[in-house]
Amino acid sequence: HSGLYGGAVHNPAEVLAELVAKMHDEKGRITLPGFYDSVRTLTPQERADFARLPNDDASYLKETGVPALWGEEGYTSAERTGARPTLEVNGLLSGWTGPGSKTVLPAKAMAKISCRLVADQQPSEVKKQMIRFMEENAPKTVQWEVKDLTHSPFAIADLNNPGVKAMHKAMESVWGMRPFYRREGGSIGAVAMLQQICGVESVLVGMGLPSDNVHSPNEHLHL
């Protein structure tokens, strides 16, 4: 009961909120220690390819309905979503969230977090960075735990791969225009597994539309 213990014990929900807020700085960069150390730098040609993409800030605003865009300084929205790592809070849970009011102190607080990894980041290293962040920032007034629910390594296509070149030629022949090379932040764990275990490259071709509502209850694909 908050009337009995409020002000004497640290509220887990408030602690979690403070920790989550600290995971990004004012420039949109992730503050986990060493998070960017192994991130592969975009080449001038790669940035030029991103600049060719039809997606601009106006299209992101229209698709999402947000009042303004946000992200890591120094990169375009296309680069942020396709080539830069992210840390996203997927969900928060704590205390009483049902109808009416209850003046209680929550015993626990939980955040589900996902990280988009890019070349050459490794999931095992990012977990260590998260634990180090918690060690450096979590107060001694609470107990905490980091659970690794699932992970997969990064995957990036080699544009000089014969399969990619063949697909490029076929698409240009059919559509009469040079195809765009676009990096996608969505994960397909099997791609990295095929690269690492079988030594084969995958050719990924986007057939979906922004209106397909990926991961939504009404996700669909036009045929």
Regions found by a protein language model. Give the residues of each.
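Hydrophobic "lid"/C-terminal helical patch
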Residues: 20, 130, 134
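An extended, acidic, His-containing surface patch that forms the Zn2+-binding/catalytic region
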Residues: 31-108, 116-129, 137, 141-223
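Non-catalytic, usually N-terminal nucleic-acid engagement modules in DNA/RNA processing proteins
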Residues: 16
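Histidine/acidic-residue-rich, glycine-tolerant segments that coordinate divalent metal ions
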Residues: 1-10
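Active-site helix-to-loop segments that bind/position phosphate- or nucleotide-bearing substrates
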Residues: 113
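Glycine-rich phosphate-binding loop plus the immediately following alpha-helix
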Residues: 13
